[in-house]
C-alpha cells in the first residue's frame, strides 16, 4: 500500500516536472519538518534505480515527441525571415506614382485594339486560375512553396496598371461648335484692309473737331463745303496720320495767333476744322522751328528798300526832330547806320514817352542772321530785318537809355506804325 502510494505520488510529480520542462537531478533533497523546532530541514537522499530509469524514459519520450511534431508557425517565421524587403526607389520630381507605369505603357507602340484585348482578357485568366487553386487540396509542402513563390513573384514581377480612359480636354478648352451659315459674315466683310478698319477712329476724330468748332463758330457762318464733305466722309479714305498731323499743325497755328496778342482777328473762314479741307491743303510746305512766324530771307539792302518804314541814309538829328513833330508812342523807322559797316548796317529808331531810342541792328556773319542791340535785350536772332519788325509788333521791345550803362531802367513798347516820310522828312 505504501509502495502504491509512493508510485502515485511519484507519477504525479513526474507529470508536473514534465510540464515544467526540466529533468530530475540525480541527487534531490526532500524537505522534512523538525518536530522539536517546527522548521523545515533539507536532507540529501540518493535516487533509487527505478526512479532513475523512469526519469530517463521520460526524457527520451520528450525528445522523440519534439522531433515528430511539425509546427507551421515556426516554418512561417523562418520563411518570412529569409525574405528581404528593400526600400522604395526614389521618384523624380517630374514623375508621380500614377504616371510612372502609364508612361512605360504609352512608350510601347501597341495599337488600341491590342491594349483593350489584353486588359479585358486578363481578369478571366485570373478567375480561372483561382478556381483551380481552390479545387486542389493544399498540402504542407505546397503551402510553403506557394508562400515562397508568391513572395518572389511579388518581388520580381511589376504589376500592370489598369487601363485609363481616353484623355479629354476640359470643358473650357474644348473647341466651340461650328457657327451656323446664317450668322457667318460674307467674305467681302471678313477680309478688309487696315485702312478701312481705321475709319471709325477717323470719323470720331472729325466729329470731335466739329463739335469743338461748333461751340466757337455759329452755324449760319459756316461754309457749305464743310457740311457737304461731312456727308461724304464714309466714302473718303484719308489716312489717320495725315489727319492727325494736320490737326496738330492747325492747333499750333491758332496758338501762335493767340500768343501774338490777337492783333489780327480770326475769321470763320480761316478757322475751319481740318475735316473741311483736303489733305493737300493741310500739308504745309514748312515746319515750325520756333514761335516766330516764317518769312523768306531778305538780308540784302535792295529787299529792305521797298518797305515803308525804311528811309535810307538820314542823320540822327533829323529823325529825332521828325519824331518830336509826330509825337506818337510806338512810331518807328529804320535808317542806315552812320558807321556804314557790315557788322552794324541799320538802326531802329523808336519814339516812346517823348523820347527817341536808337537801337542798332547787328549782322552775324557766322549764322547769316540779325540781332538787335548789344545783347542786353536778349540773345534773340532773326533771319531778316522784316522778322524783327514783325516780331516787335506783336511783342513789346525793351527800350534802354543809352546813358544808363547798367541797363536797370527799362521800358517796354510795341511797334505800332511807321513814321510818315512825306510829312516830316524831306528827301535827300
Swiss-Prot record:
Domain of life from the UniProt record: Eukaryota
Q: Which InterPro entries match?
A: Immunoreceptor_sig_adapters, SH2, SH2_dom_sf
Q: Where is the SH2 domain?
A: 309-419
Tell me any Pfam family this protein matches: SH2
Q: Name one GO cellular component term.
A: cytoplasm
Indicate the annotated site residue(s) for Interaction with FYB1: 335
- Coiled-coil stretches, from where to where? none
One GO biological-process annotation of the entry reads: positive regulation of natural killer cell cytokine production
What keywords does the record list, in alphabetical order? Cytoplasm, Phosphoprotein, SH2 domain
Q: Where in the cell is it found?
A: Cytoplasm
Q: Region labeled Mediates interaction with PLCG1 — which residues?
A: 159-164
Q: Does the keyword Cytoplasm apply?
A: yes
Output the PTM entry.
Tyrosine-phosphorylated upon BCR cross-linking. Tyrosine phosphorylation at both Tyr-69 and Tyr-96 are required for BCR-induced calcium response and are essential to restore PLCG2-mediated signaling in BLNK-deficient DT40 cells, but this phosphorylation is dispensable in cells expressing LAT. Interacts with the SH2 domain of PLCG1 via phosphorylated Tyr-96. Tyrosine phosphorylation is increased when complexed with SKAP1 and FYB1.
Which positions carry Phosphotyrosine? 69, 96
Ranges of compositional bias, category Low complexity: 244-253
Give me the ranges of the annotated region Disordered.
1-22, 135-198, 244-271
- Which Gene Ontology molecular-function terms are recorded? protein-containing complex binding
Record flagged with keyword Cytoplasm: yes
Which region ranges are annotated with the description Mediates interaction with LAT, GRB2, and FGR?
Answer: 178-180
Q: What is known of its domains?
A: The N-terminal proline-rich region interacts with the SH3 domain of PLCG1. The SH2 domain is important for restoration of BCR-induced calcium response and JNK2 activation in BLNK-deficient DT40 cells expressing LAT.
Please describe the quaternary structure of this protein: When phosphorylated, interacts with PLCG1, PLCG2, GRB2, VAV and LAT. Interacts with LBR and AGO2. Interacts with FGR. Part of a complex consisting of CLNK, SKAP1 and FYB1. Interacts (via SH2 domain) with FYB1; this interaction allows SKAP1 and FYB1 to promote tyrosine phosphorylation of CLNK by LYN. Interacts (via SH2 domain) with MAP4K1.
Q: What does this protein do?
A: An adapter protein which plays a role in the regulation of immunoreceptor signaling, including PLC-gamma-mediated B-cell antigen receptor (BCR) signaling and FC-epsilon R1-mediated mast cell degranulation. Together with FGR, it acts as a negative regulator of natural killer cell-activating receptors and inhibits interferon-gamma production. Acts as a positive regulator of both T-cell receptor and natural killer T (NKT) cell receptor signaling in CD4-positive NKT cells. Together with MAP4K1, it enhances CD3-triggered activation of T-cells and subsequent IL2 production.
Protein name per its UniProtKB record: Cytokine-dependent hematopoietic cell linker
Organism this protein belongs to: Homo sapiens
Gene that this polypeptide is encoded by: CLNK
Amino acid at each position: 500500500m505504501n509502495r502504491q502510494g509512493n508510485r502515485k505520488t511519484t507519477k504525479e510529480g513526474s507529470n508536473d516536472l514534465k510540464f515544467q520542462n526540466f529533468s530530475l537531478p540525480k541527487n534531490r533533497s526532500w524537505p522534512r519538518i523538525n518536530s522539536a523546532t517546527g522548521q523545515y530541514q533539507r536532507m540529501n537522499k540518493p535516487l533509487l534505480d527505478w526512479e532513475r530509469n523512469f526519469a530517463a524514459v521520460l526524457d527520451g519520450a520528450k525528445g522523440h515527441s519534439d522531433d515528430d511534431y511539425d509546427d507551421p508557425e515556426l516554418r512561417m517565421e523562418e520563411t518570412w525571415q529569409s525574405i528581404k524587403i528593400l526600400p522604395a526607389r526614389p521618384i523624380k520630381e517630374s514623375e508621380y506614382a500614377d504616371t510612372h507605369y502609364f508612361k512605360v505603357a504609352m512608350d510601347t507602340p501597341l495599337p488600341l485594339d491590342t491594349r483593350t484585348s489584353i486588359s479585358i482578357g486578363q481578369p478571366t485568366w485570373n478567375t480561372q486560375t483561382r478556381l483551380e487553386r481552390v479545387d486542389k487540396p493544399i498540402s504542407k509542402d505546397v503551402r510553403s512553396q506557394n508562400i515562397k513563390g508568391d513572395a518572389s513573384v511579388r518581388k520580381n514581377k511589376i504589376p500592370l496598371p489598369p487601363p485609363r480612359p481616353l484623355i479629354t480636354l476640359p470643358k473650357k478648352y474644348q473647341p466651340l461648335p461650328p457657327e451656323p451659315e446664317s450668322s457667318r459674315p460674307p467674305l467681302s466683310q471678313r477680309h478688309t484692309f487696315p485702312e478701312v478698319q481705321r475709319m471709325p477712329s477717323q470719323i470720331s476724330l472729325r466729329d470731335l473737331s466739329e463739335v469743338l468748332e461748333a461751340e466757337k463758330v455759329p452755324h449760319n457762318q459756316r461754309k457749305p463745303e464743310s457740311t457737304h464733305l461731312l456727308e461724304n466722309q464714309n466714302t473718303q479714305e484719308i489716312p489717320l496720320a495725315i489727319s492727325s498731323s494736320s490737326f496738330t499743325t492747325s492747333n499750333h497755328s491758332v496758338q501762335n495767333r493767340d500768343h501774338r496778342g490777337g492783333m489780327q482777328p480770326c475769321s470763320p473762314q480761316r478757322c475751319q476744322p481740318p475735316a473741311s479741307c483736303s489733305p493737300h491743303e493741310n500739308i504745309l510746305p514748312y515746319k515750325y522751328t520756333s514761335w516766330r512766324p516764317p518769312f523768306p530771307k531778305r538780308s540784302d539792302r535792295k529787299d529792305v528798300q521797298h518797305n515803308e518804314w525804311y528811309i535810307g541814309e538820314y542823320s540822327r538829328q533829323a529823325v529825332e526832330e521828325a519824331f518830336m513833330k509826330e509825337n506818337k508812342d510806338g512810331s518807328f523807322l529804320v535808317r542806315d547806320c552812320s558807321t556804314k559797316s557790315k557788322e552794324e548796317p541799320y538802326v531802329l529808331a523808336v519814339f516812346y514817352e517823348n523820347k527817341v531810342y536808337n537801337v542798332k541792328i547787328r549782322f552775324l556773319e557766322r549764322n547769316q542772321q540779325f540781332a538787335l542791340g548789344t545783347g542786353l535785350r536778349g540773345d534773340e536772332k532773326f533771319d531778316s530785318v522784316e522778322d524783327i519788325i514783325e516780331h516787335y509788333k506783336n511783342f513789346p521791345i525793351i527800350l534802354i537809355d543809352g546813358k544808363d550803362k547798367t541797363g536797370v531802367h527799362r521800358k517796354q513798347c510795341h511797334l505800332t506804325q511807321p513814321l510818315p516820310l512825306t510829312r516830316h522828312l524831306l528827301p535827300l
